[in-house]
């Protein structure tokens, strides 16, 4: 009897623990799952208000950089320091390319990996395949394919000697260096030499064949810009990560300015009228801001704290990283490093290489706290 009474407290304690465990299990079952995306993933970098402020600043900043880049060739003749064939221009351009590379690899791509490998997403398929790297690779290859196909279609559609000039002397036109890559690059100062070497095409930009060739180049460059600028702007507009948006604004301003210089030189050489020039400048300058505005509208479609936000922003960031990689290496750097200006000047080539490292290194250091 005494043994039974001594076991009573033990039994009461056991029953109490069972009830407590059942209560905890029941409360855990009714507690909603933690939010995915938003501050749960971005931490201190996630801020809808600050991100919106940066986007609203980015739209006019990128617009101004685009307009300045396109219009700069108009004044380059009177200001020697601003001429695209100068050594200082090549070094500054290399530094800007390093900034673009660093932004893509050190800021945008890591955020894409974080979003697409978040534990908030289903393990299948997001944790079993590197979607971020895959989409970045596809974006770069797709941009190359679009540029190449557009050049092919425009070349076949052009008749007479101008099409032959594009096919055989494309490597002597600086104005399309940003769009067509290594096989189509060189300095503006070598254009006349290429025309003299062609035999049947008169020297100068006033001939009919040369004008048609330059107009084909402008159309190819313009369409390529529209494709990738909208995608990158869309990725920035959809992101709520301040640490991603801040360096991306600087990188896009650099890119739009230098690519605008290339397009502006093309437009001048193509001999377009004032109305056509204005239309080309307008479309170039507004594509990236339009993409940002479109991304802002996209954020209204889904909840910022949902798995959908992680997938959408992660995929767009991955595509943006691939495009930044392509733009920096193919459109900006290959044109100069494989051209005669840097190939014939080792000191200038080393200075440009150092500028790339400084630009990319600066963005890498920023990734430590931004």
From Swiss-Prot:
Induction: By iron deficiency in roots. GO terms for molecular function: zinc ion transmembrane transporter activity. One of its GO terms (cellular component) is plasma membrane. One of its GO terms (biological process) is iron ion transport. Residues 1-25 form the signal peptide. The chain crosses the membrane at residues 56-76, 86-106, 131-151, 216-236, 248-268, 279-299, 310-330, 350-370. It is found in: Cell membrane. It is a multi-pass membrane protein. It comes from the Eukaryota. Residues 77-85, 152-215, 269-278, 331-349 are cytoplasmic. Its main location: membrane. Keywords: Cell membrane, Ion transport, Iron, Iron transport, Membrane, Signal, Transmembrane, Transmembrane helix, Transport. Disulfide bonds: none annotated. Belongs to the ZIP transporter (TC 2.A.5) family. This is Fe(2+) transport protein 2. It comes from Oryza sativa subsp. japonica (Rice).
């Amino acid at each position: 009897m005494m043994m039974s009474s001594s076991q009573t407290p033990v039994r009461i304690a056991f029953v109490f623990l069972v009830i407590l465990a059942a209560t905890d299990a029941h409360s855990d079952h009714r507690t909603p799952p933690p939010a995915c995306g938003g501050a749960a993933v971005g931490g201190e970098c996630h801020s809808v208000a600050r991100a919106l402020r940066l986007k609203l600043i980015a739209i006019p900043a990128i617009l101004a950089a685009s307009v300045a880049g396109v219009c700069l060739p108009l004044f380059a003749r009177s200001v020697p320091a601003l001429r695209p064939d100068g050594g200082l221009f090549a070094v500054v351009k290399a530094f800007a390319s390093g900034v673009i590379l660093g932004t893509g690899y050190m800021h945008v791509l890591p955020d894409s990996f974080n979003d697409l490998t978040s534990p908030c997403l289903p393990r299948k398929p997001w944790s079993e395949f590197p979607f971020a790297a895959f989409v970045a690779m596809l974006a770069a290859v797709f941009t190359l394919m679009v540029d190449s196909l557009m050049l092919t279609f425009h070349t076949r559609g052009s008749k007479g000697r101008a099409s032959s000039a594009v096919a055989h002397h494309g490597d002597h036109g600086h104005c399309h260096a940003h769009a067509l890559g290594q096989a189509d690059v060189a300095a503006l100062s070598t254009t006349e030499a290429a025309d003299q070497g062609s035999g049947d095409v008169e020297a100068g930009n006033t001939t009919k064949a040369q004008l048609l060739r330059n107009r084909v180049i402008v159309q190819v460059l313009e369409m390529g810009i529209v494709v990738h600028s909208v995608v990158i702007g869309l990725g920035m507009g959809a992101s709520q990560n301040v640490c991603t948006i801040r360096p991306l604004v600087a990188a896009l301003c650099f890119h739009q300015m230098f690519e605008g210089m290339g397009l502006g030189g093309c437009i001048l050489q193509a001999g377009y009228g004032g109305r056509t020039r204005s239309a080309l400048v307008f479309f170039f300058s507004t594509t990236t801001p339009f993409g940002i505005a479109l991304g802002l509208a996209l954020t209204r479609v889904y909840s910022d704290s949902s798995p959908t936000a992680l997938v959408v922003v992660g995929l767009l960031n991955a595509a943006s990283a691939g495009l930044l990689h392509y733009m920096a290496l193919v459109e900006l750097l290959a044109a100069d490093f494989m051209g005669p200006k840097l190939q014939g000047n080792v000191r200038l080539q080393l200075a440009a290489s150092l500028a790339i490292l400084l630009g990319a290194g600066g963005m890498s250091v920023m990734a430590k706290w931004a």
